[in-house]
């Protein structure tokens, strides 16, 4: 049985930058979802007696255990493809899990951290918008629109000040013919207001009264240390340094975790989108989910990004504030307003309570229901942590042959300064 190479992750530890600049999120998504991250030149490549590949690189690779490497331009051509990093003996050497026993490399090619497998369907001339979709879509795969615009289409009725908090407006659509094709009431969207299909993409008002978007993916904001702190998007933010982040997933779903306040590296929030494992027939209702900071606060409204309902941040805080978006289960009327999903794991204390502290990996799946009383299914990849591993940054773990990473999340107000977090399952290392 071959080693799984579908789920990939990226981190700031790879040398990627997420700073206080407009465009940083889109550039990061381009790299992680579409292009991948090239490694430095390969000085030698060999196949050992077990059939694994050893790469010696000209400079530091900054790659992490269990990331996926894509090889191109090698001879014989059978060498080209995707491989899991099995070992990192030093900063310039990688060992890739392969099944190439008895083969030899005659020509060395190039290597990169493989992308998650998406493509850019549309981009705008000003380079502030993207529409992504998986490279091999089925009818269930949505178009993923990411918009960092600061003004309304007329450039006057809505203007967001560039020094305010940095976030993109993000949503899912069933079909698109151009980058701003989001006003058709007959096309499914998430989030969706049937009386105002463009609601997620609107910028209205100016100055401190501006409202920009609805489902927001933040990457730089004056953040909170506890439930009692509240800040506005217009509040001054730390403009120095690069944020910490992890982006993990595959062609079906991915999650983006980052610390919106650069001074608090472990206080990450989670956003994400894609398909979930539904208990319902997908011909009746699309199995989409979308997580972010769901709010329509003005730029000067004080709120806590993580803990304050009705503002919601995916799986953070509580059953009230930790909701995410799914399409409403109404097969007779699919073009209806979205509903909210709730994790079925009690307490929203993933990675905080030591319920099974003796287990190397205490990971369970994430079943969830919705506000209308329906059980909906399970989230892909992400797992509830039933112990506090005390990791300080993204950490690869292997349990028998199962590969995981663990990442911190500041997810429960009752826990004070105790960091929670999630496991993410990446498949089997065979």
Residue ranges with predicted function:
Residues 1-40, 100, 394, 415-430:
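Short, intrinsically disordered N-terminal pre-domain segments
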Residues 4-10, 16, 32-53, 76-249, ...:
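Small/polar beta-strand repeat architecture
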